[in-house]
Regions:
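Hydrophobic residues at beta-strand termini and immediately following loops
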Residues: 55, 102, 368
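PLP-dependent aminotransferase-like
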Residues: 67, 71-147, 151-163, 167-172, ...
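Structural detector of well-ordered beta-strand residues that form the stable sheet scaffold
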Residues: 53, 78, 100, 168-169, ...
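Active-site PLP attachment segment
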Residues: 192-230, 253
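PLP-dependent aminotransferase class I/II
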Residues: 37-41, 49-52, 113, 125-137, ...
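Conserved active-site segment immediately N-terminal to the catalytic lysine
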Residues: 170-207, 238-243
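Buried hydrophobic packing segments
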Residues: 61-66, 87, 91, 213, ...
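Conserved PLP-binding active-site segment in aminotransferase class I/II-type PLP enzymes
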Residues: 1-68, 72, 140, 144, ...
Length: 389
């Protein structure tokens, strides 16, 4: 890369072009074709699950997960407020449910202490589930996002979900490649430990199919239902009979070809992400009060994919938006972290708890360039520009 340094872009090469050409020359370019099934099998093997259901986006994957899990109108779902809004809408408003927003801890992931506090002190546990004392609604599920590829505290969150009779939905849309390497969950990949998990192949993710996603579940019937819903709920394909409302959430054969090529390169992408993260951290941590926010590492029993890098400005005296503008002037694309979802136009009346850290990180984070084809020289240019702010 030279000149403009983008935030996060696809890394395609000859392999992706060759694989996609196979689909094009065969004529199987749409949602039918053998490569979709082949990609599903490869994904399932990579994350260590018996089955993966391909979809056309991470958002649709989460919608399928919510429906397969039985979340319905009138339910409530505990969700993080510091995340992309597509992590919340499909689990709540798409299916008629309402969110309960919870802030983050220093991993940027949902705070287990705050989740526990809400369940213990704002709800009543009954034989058939957990009920919100304020609204009387059943709190049916807990949505967990592995933010920027950093593993959430799954042992704690799984325990909370079990004790309070909550379905646990993992949003691993940013965390493909992240897994536990030690401890009680050793070998488990992000997205595979809850009741159902979802992933994304958007263009800015660690690997991409242009757009796409997939669903895995520890309940075989949930995965089967997700597949059924994604294909317009066809009960009889020949006679065009449908047994419920379904959706066109299918992945195309061309996308699956891109995915197969990218999956073969994924471990190399993870290595590059770690190398550039280490380069940023060694050069910028502590300079002028700046910090590169940490990921859980091997010493914590986790192999992180280091998807997005966060420069933390609080102790530097620098203004977030000024930093973004000055770097943009030098041809370096950065961005702020997401606006909190409980402050978005559609959610001002929903309950929200333990927001202080999320508000702080919203104000002081700048995400730095992190493409898997970001070179050491590109990274040095970003570092020099940051040091000269």
């Amino acid at each position: 890369m030279s000149g403009f340094i983008p935030l996060s872009v696809p890394n395609f090469g000859e392999k992706e072009a060759a694989y996609a050409a196979e689909a094009i020359t065969s004529g199987w370019v749409s949602t039918s074709g053998a490569k979709v099934s082949e990609f599903e099998e490869a994904l399932a093997a990579y994350v260590g699950m018996p089955r993966a259901v391909a979809a056309n986006s991470g958002t649709s994957s989460l919608h399928l997960a919510a429906m397969a899990a039985g979340i319905r109108r009138g339910d409530e779902v505990i969700v993080p407020t510091l995340t992309f809004i597509a992590a919340v809408n499909p689990l709540t408003r798409y299916v008629g449910a309402e969110p309960i927003f919870i802030g983050c801890n220093d991993t940027l992931c949902i705070d287990p202490d705050a989740v526990e506090n809400f369940c213990a002190n704002h709800c009543t546990l009954k034989e058939d589930g957990l009920y919100n004392n304020k609204t009387g609604a059943r709190v049916r599920a807990l949505g967990v996002v592995h933010v920027f590829g950093n593993m959430a505290d799954m042992p704690r969150l799984l325990d909370i979900a079990r004790r309070y009779k909550l379905i646990l939905i993992e949003d691993a849309t940013e965390a493909l490649g992240t897994r536990y390497t030690a401890g009680p969950l050793a070998g488990k990949a992000a997205g595979t430990m809850g009741d159902i998990g979802c992933y994304s192949f958007n263009g800015n993710k660690i690997m991409t199919t242009g757009a796409g996603g997939f669903v895995v579940s520890n309940h075989a019937d949930w995965a089967e239902h997700a597949k059924h819903l994604s294909t317009q709920a066809k009960a009889d394909m020949l006679q065009f009979l449908h047994d419920e409302i379904g959706y066109n959430y299918r992945m195309t054969n061309v996308q699956a070809c891109l995915g197969l090529a990218q999956l073969e390169r994924l471990e190399g992408f993870v290595e590059t992400k770690k190398a550039r993260y280490d380069q940023y951290k060694a050069a910028l941590d502590g300079v002028h009060g700046l910090r590169i926010l940490p990921f859980k590492e091997e010493s914590d029993g986790v192999r992180s994919n280091h998807w997005f890098y966060s420069l933390y400005l609080k102790d530097s005296g620098l203004d977030r938006d000024t930093v973004i503008a000055k770097l943009q002037e030098q041809g370096i694309q950065t961005r702020p972290v997401w606006a909190l979802i409980n402050e978005q136009a559609d959610y001002p009346k929903n309950e929200a708890y333990a927001l202080e850290k999320a508000q702080d990180y919203r104000k002081y984070i700048v995400n730095l360039p992190c493409s898997t084809n970001l070179t050491e020289q590109d990274c040095e240019r970003v570092i020099a520009a940051v040091k000269n702010l």
